[in-house]
Amino acid sequence: KGMAYANTVKAYPFGNEYMQLSGGKHAMLSEEKLDQFQKIYDLCDRNGIRLVLLTVPSANTWNKGKSDTVKQLAKKYDLTYYDYNRQLPAGFDWATDSKDGGNHLNYTGASAVTKDLAKKLTDDLTMSPTSLTKEQKQQWKKDYEHFHKSIVK
C-alpha cells in the first residue's frame, strides 16, 4: 500500500558506477534536517522503537558521498543501516528493475528490495514477520487482489 505501481522498464545502463561519482566528498546535512532527524530519533527512543535507516537503489539521485553521510549518522546513533545502493538485493538488475532509467524502481525492483528487507528485518533484527490479526490479514489480501485487478484492466 503506497507504491505507485509501474511495470514499465527503462534500464539504467551503467550498473553501480553511480556510487563512485561523489569524488570522495561527504554530503552535508542541513541543520534543519539534522534537527528533524533528532526529533524522530528521540521519539523512537522514548517509545522503545528501534529506528532503522534505509536507502533504496536510486542511480540518478544517490552517490557514495550521500551513502557515507548516512553511514556516519547510523554509526553516531548506533543504528542499523541498510544501504541498497552499495549492496543491491539478490535478483536486482538495473537493466530490468527501473521504470525511468535509474531514479525509481518498477514493480520487480521494488519487490526485490521488499523481499530482501523483510528477510533482513526478521533475520538480523529478530522482528516477527507480522502481528496483524486474522481480520487485518484478510483485509490486506482483499486490498491486494483489488489492486492487482485494477492494474490489469
Predicted features along the sequence, with ranges:
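A near-ubiquitous, low-amplitude feature marking generic local secondary-structure context
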Residues: 20-23, 27, 53, 96, ...
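Acidic-and-aromatic substrate-binding clefts and catalytic sites of carbohydrate-active enzymes
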Residues: 28-31, 57-66
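C-terminal regions of proteins
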Residues: 64-153
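Secreted/periplasmic serine-hydrolase-like ester/acetyl group-modifying domain
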Residues: 1-47, 134-153
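Detector for Asparagine
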Residues: 7, 16, 47, 60-63, ...
